A protein has these predicted regions:
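Juxtamembrane intracellular "pre-TM" segments in multi-pass secondary transporters
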Residues: 26-36, 224-271
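Extracytoplasmic gate region of multi-pass secondary transporters
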Residues: 60-61, 264-319, 377
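Helix-breaking motifs and short loop linkers at transmembrane-helix boundaries and internal kinks
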Residues: 72, 104, 125-131, 159, ...
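Conserved MFS/SLC helix-loop-helix module at the cytosolic interface between two early adjacent transmembrane helices
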Residues: 91-127
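Cytoplasmic helix-loop-helix junction between adjacent transmembrane helices
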Residues: 135-176
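Helix-loop-helix hairpin linking two adjacent transmembrane segments in secondary transporters
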Residues: 170, 174-220
Length: 463
């Protein structure tokens, strides 16, 4: 495990300080005036990892009608594929969080990306539906394992001032991968064959794994150290708290660590809200091309292209606006309040996308929904990082991703099952809406605890 900074570095004149930045390296001069003292490459590299993860997971959504025709399975079984994969991922997430707090994070991420590429090739080689189903479970299980080490690494490279933008890069890659996977899956399946979809997608994974090796392992707690040094310059030190939660890395059980983290009220709210959000988003992106194909009489290629292109545009807009607004203001509970508004916009947009007839109206509302969801995500991720002490961020993000993954697991299955029961896929899409409004309520209830929880986390990181 990489140690947290053992001694508080001294400030130099001119707004710089010497401190150890990398796990294997000497001290170096750090400019405290820069928003991102170590540049944006670590965030970009992790964004590429998040992108290829979601591309490989969502290829099946774009090619789903063709794959259904080949293997002959129902909508319920189609929805069960991502559900089973997500449950498998959830089982591994808490151990992955423990690993992220103890093992080199860069190396862990590289191995995970290589496993994705291998599973993508195996998907294309499957000769029976059972083989295909099992490989998709494997890639789903591996798909979420990059998140705890990647999120922990970003929190160390980027102090609070730039943390929202850093997570914005990662969330942008993640959410752009959703429509990109849908578009690629639909286009390649229509032009070539559904097997070619998975063979082609394996190649970028190898390239991104090599790029990730250029990122050096940072010292744990580095971002928090920079925040404390900046506070010293202004004469306003981060407040200490008597209500200290001991979350240092120990030999405690996974469940004991998780229970300790869930004492943080803001984290509980963020986790539950993201779980409800994930249910809606997972169901939306998985079934949207099929929804458009059946209700608007579009072909597979056109439906996938519209779903991915319009959704991707909304995501880009939401990420840019959300991350900039989140980092710009520091008023009480700002990130949580901003996220609440963004999720409300997204929930309303998705409701109208399902209810309003016509391709143009539906796609305009899909863009609005995606912009709202994407605007919330970097701020929720940054808020989670800010309320969890540095030594336990890997476990904290694993817990967040664990429950979020479980929430998202049932979105595609819910839509598919309701489609089979009612005979109309629109009813299944309507069932995604109540959880989204519930996520808005959950965030609103914890908005007042964010600043106190962030202060306690900062105090814990300094011990």
């Amino acid at each position: 495990m990489t140690d947290i900074q053992p001694d508080e570095p001294l400030l130099h004149q001119g707004g710089s300080a010497r401190l150890r930045v990398h796990a294997r390296g000497d001290e170096q001069e750090v400019d405290l005036d820069r928003d991102a003292p170590f540049g944006w490459w670590p965030a970009i590299a992790i964004a590429l990892v998040a992108f290829i993860d979601r591309v490989e997971i969502n290829l099946i959504a774009g090619a789903l009608p063709v794959i259904q025709d080949h293997f002959g399975f129902s909508d319920t079984v189609g929805g069960l594929i991502p559900t089973a994969a997500s449950i498998a991922a959830a089982v591994l997430l808490l151990p992955a969080g423990r690993l992220a707090d103890r093992a080199p994070r860069v190396g862990t991420i590289v191995i995970v990306v290589l496993v994705w590429s291998l599973c993508s090739v195996l998907s294309g080689l499957a000769t029976t539906f059972l083989m295909f189903f099992m490989v998709r479970i494997a890639i789903g299980a591996a798909g979420q394992l990059y998140n705890p080490p990647a999120s922990s690494l970003l929190a160390d490279y980027y102090p609070n001032r730039s943390r929202g933008k850093a997570y914005g890069f990662e969330r942008a890659g993640y959410y752009m991968g959703l429509p990109a996977g849908v578009i690629i899956g639909g286009a390649v399946a229509e032009a070539l064959d559904w097997r070619a979809v998975f063979f082609i997608a394996a190649v970028p994974g190898l390239f991104i794994a090599a790029l990730m090796l250029t990122v050096k392992e940072p010292v744990r707690g580095l971002g928090d150290t920079i925040d404390r040094l900046r506070a010293q310059r202004t004469g306003v030190a981060p407040p200490e708290s008597e209500a200290h939660v001991d979350l240092s890395v120990s030999s405690a059980s996974l469940w004991a660590d998780a229970k300790e983290l869930l004492r943080i009220r803001t984290l509980r709210g963020v986790i539950l809200a993201q779980a409800m959000l994930a249910l809606g988003v997972a169901g939306l992106f998985y079934w949207l091309p099929t929804f458009l194909e059946r209700l608007e009489d579009l072909d597979t290629d056109t439906a996938s292209g519209l779903a991915g292109g319009v959704g991707g545009t909304g995501i880009v807009i939401g990420i840019i606006i959300g991350s900039r607004l989140g980092d710009r203001h520091e008023s009480e509970g700002w990130r949580i309040r901003l996220s609440t508004v963004c999720l409300l916009v997204g929930a309303i947009g998705l409701s109208l996308a399902v209810l309003l007839p016509g391709v143009g109206l539906r796609m305009a509302m899909v863009a609005l929904a995606c912009a709202g969801f994407a605007g919330a995500m970097p701020n929720l991720t940054a808020a989670a990082a800010n309320v969890v002490p540095a030594a336990s961020r890997g476990m904290g993000f694993a817990l967040l991703q664990f429950l979020t993954t479980l929430g998202g697991a049932f979105g595609p299955l819910l839509v598919g099952a309701m489609s089979d029961v009612t005979g109309w896929i629109g009813y299944g899409m309507l069932f995604l809406i109540p959880p989204l409004f519930l996520s808005v309520v959950l965030l609103w209830l914890v908005r007042g605890s964010y600043d106190a929880d962030a202060a306690r986390a900062s105090a814990s990181s300094s011990h």
